[in-house]
UniProtKB/Swiss-Prot annotation:
GO terms for biological process: arginine biosynthetic process via ornithine; citrulline biosynthetic process; L-arginine biosynthetic process. Transmembrane segments: none annotated. GO terms for molecular function: amino acid binding; ornithine carbamoyltransferase activity. Coiled coil: none annotated. This is Ornithine carbamoyltransferase. It holds the Pfam family OTCace_N. The gene is argF. It comes from Alkaliphilus metalliredigens (strain QYMF). Belongs to the aspartate/ornithine carbamoyltransferase superfamily. OTCase family. Pathway: Amino-acid biosynthesis; L-arginine biosynthesis; L-arginine from L-ornithine and carbamoyl phosphate: step 1/3. Carbamoyl phosphate binds at S57, T58, R59, T60, Q84, R108, H135, P136, T137, Q138, C273, L274, R318.
Length: 330
């Protein structure tokens, strides 16, 4: 059955079927191949796209801008100080105004309710570039990367997410894994595991797709036979005062070479959505080292630079998967 996503918003992977997600992944692969061959795209010719950012970004902003330009669209960027959204103008009114000017809208910010309100009132496709609850565009990039590096269908992949598993990445990876029938393990301290309602909802989805959702605080159990170990920063945007608490909670969950070896899988891959605190080459990294004596946090520099690491392929794939979302929905 053909997949048609025209006019659809992209707010969370919960809204999409396995077939629709696979369609976006296949389209991403095709668009990536065309870019590599130097084929100029025209799928978004004459389209106007607005990017609304409450939170700072490198990969998401660049991926949306380059993807849109690659396919012929025009882009307007509005940062946190460039619009009146939520300050002098309601989110609903902003959505209605921008919907008259633009063909598509991306939002990256704090509340999931904001992107949902924009989608409800804009009358155009709205894409979630990250909220505190979900980060769905990242998951498409992650799954495309797995398809490129692991010689298995997604529904045969064993995936371990290690660290703060109740953040937007933990939530979104669990949703995506359930949809695609994967063996997903959230490996974290009990207090940082995903919350019950979403877990039960995704276990029901996994029961239909042949997937499995496991929550554990046991690292050895969680990473055994894993094809993928994935981690993220220990402190999300807006939680910068939590470093001391998170370091105490998560240091036993740092991805190091011992953890890689504990998978028993010499061909496993390491993934991270970036940015990563793996060395002392950042201001924050230096501050953490001075205060807590750590040279790295969620992943060691050894693992980050090892043959197992595919983080920069993963980062590149943000471009191709975001392009696929825009092409498919506009």
């Amino acid at each position: 059955m053909p997949v048609n996503l025209k006019g659809r918003s992209f707010l969370t992977l919960k809204d999409f079927t396995s077939q629709e997600i696979q369609h976006l992944l296949d389209l991403s692969r095709d668009l990536k191949a065309k870019k590599r061959m130097g084929v100029k795209g025209e799928s978004l010719l004459g389209k106007n796209i607005v990017l609304l950012f409450e939170k700072a970004s490198t990969r998401t902003r660049c991926a949306f801008e380059v993807a849109a330009l690659d396919e012929g669209a025009h882009v307007t960027f509005l940062g946190s100080n460039d619009s009146q959204i939520g300050k002098k103008e309601s989110i609903e009114d902003t959505a209605k105004v921008l919907g008259r000017f633009y063909d598509g809208m991306e939002f990256r910010g704090f509340k999931q309710e904001t992107v949902e309100t924009l989608a409800a009132h804009a009358g155009i496709p709205v894409w979630n570039g990250l909220t505190d609850l979900y980060h769905p565009t990242q998951i498409l990039a992650d799954f495309l990367t797995i398809m490129e590096h692991i010689d298995k269908p997604l529904n045969k992949v064993k995936f371990a997410y290690v660290g703060d598993a109740r953040n937007n990445m933990g939530n979104s990876l669990m949703i995506g894994a359930a949809k695609m029938g994967m063996d997903f393990r959230a490996v974290a301290p009990k207090e940082l595991l995903p919350k019950g309602e979403l877990v039960e909802e995704m276990r029901a989805v996994a029961a239909e797709t042949g997937g499995e959702i496991t929550l554990t605080d046991d690292v050895a159990e969680g990473v055994k036979d894993a094809d993928v170990i994935y981690t993220d920063v220990w402190v999300s945007m807006g939680e910068e005062d939590q470093f001391e608490v998170r370091i105490k909670q998560l240091l036993p969950y740092q991805v190091n070479m011992d953890m890689i070896k504990a998978t028993g899988n010499p061909d496993m891959i390491f993934m991270h959505c970036l940015p990563a605190f793996h060395d002392l080459e950042t201001t924050v990294g230096k501050e953490i080292h001075e205060k807590f004596g750590l040279k790295s946090m969620e992943v060691t520099d050894e693992v980050f630079r090892s043959r197992h690491s595919v983080v920069f392929d993963e980062a590149e794939n943000r471009l191709h998967t975001i392009k696929a979302i825009m092409v498919a929905t506009l």
